[in-house]
């Protein structure tokens, strides 16, 4: 999609949310709060919850595209959905294959302008995907070393822990 189409989609999503009734907004916001429950249900029986998974994936893809084209934007529900999908990524690997590549691309190109909490959520997600062996050390370590340039003490601590953990596993 081109950037003009993305802007139209973003405007449409914003317009739809702004024009929701209070009940619809509560339902949408409640959907984010129920992610841990859905994660547990998916872990138990993933085929029964495919419809809910797809619904949330559609929302997440829209938010992912917004972040891809406007990386300095912070979306709270994006962070929650990102961690949710990272936790269940081993259950739906083909549907969620775009996440690691997209996160690496966003962080490589825009790590200095991404808001602090978004960077932390993205690094947490990549770390979780790495622990699930959905990413190799060769895919994340160069990025993690590059991210050490950020003037973010919490992020640097997290990155050092991830790097040391990966290097320890490699050397065993």
Name each model-derived stretch.
Residues 155-156:
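Eukaryote-specific intrinsically disordered, low-complexity regulatory regions enriched
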Residues 2-150, 163-171:
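Alpha-helical solenoid scaffolds in large eukaryotic transport, assembly, and signaling factors
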């Amino acid at each position: 999609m081109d950037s003009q189409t993305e802007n139209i989609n973003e405007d449409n999503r914003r317009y739809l949310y702004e024009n929701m009734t209070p009940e619809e907004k509560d339902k949408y916001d409640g959907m984010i709060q129920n992610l841990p429950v859905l994660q547990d249900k998916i872990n138990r029986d993933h085929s029964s919850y495919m419809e809910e998974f797809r619904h949330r994936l559609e929302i997440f893809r829209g938010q992912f595209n917004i972040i891809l084209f406007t990386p300095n934007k912070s979306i709270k529900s994006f962070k929650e959905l990102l961690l949710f999908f990272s936790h269940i990524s081993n259950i739906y690997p083909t549907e969620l294959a775009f996440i690691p590549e997209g996160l690496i691309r966003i962080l490589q190109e825009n790590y200095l302008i991404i808001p602090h909490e978004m960077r932390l959520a993205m690094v947490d997600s990549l770390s979780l995907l790495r622990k699930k062996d959905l990413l190799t050390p060769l895919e994340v370590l160069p990025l993690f070393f590059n991210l050490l340039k950020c003037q973010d003490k919490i992020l640097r601590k997290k990155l050092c822990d991830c790097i040391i953990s990966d290097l320890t596993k490699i050397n065993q």
